Amino acid sequence: MSKTLNIIWQYLRAFVLIYACLYAGIFIASLLPVTIPGSIIGMLILFVLLALQILPAKWVNPGCYVLIRYMALLFVPIGVGVMQYFDLLRAQFGPVVVSCAISTLVVFLVMSWSSQLVHGERKVVGQKGSEE
């Protein structure tokens, strides 16, 4: 009985913490003059709490495993909603594909530039011009 209550407590604590970050993000988003989704701000809050080790990762692990395990199921309503606008998507297929391709290219270029900026060029041992 005690083990069952402990497992229930771990899952309950995980979901409460995840939802607390979500609703804090929604609240902060409602105060901002710029439109940023509250779920994104909530994820950033959760990330900061975990990165600074204010919130132990083991407290949110059980809830995260459940959400990741059933993630595909959570996308079904979105897919059904998109299919309601299939005619509109078919009419705008070209611009949608072009915008996806351009945004993918922009993300690729920005990430490669920022990676080069952060990591820099590394000298290889034995490379011409490297000091030994």
Curated annotation (Swiss-Prot):
The chain crosses the membrane at residues 7-27, 31-51, 63-83, 93-113. InterPro entries: LrgA/CidA, Uncharacterised_UPF0299. Its main location: membrane. Disulfide bonds: none annotated. It is found in: Cell inner membrane. GO terms for cellular component: plasma membrane. This is UPF0299 membrane protein YohJ. The lineage of its organism: Bacteria, Pseudomonadati, Pseudomonadota, Gammaproteobacteria, Enterobacterales.
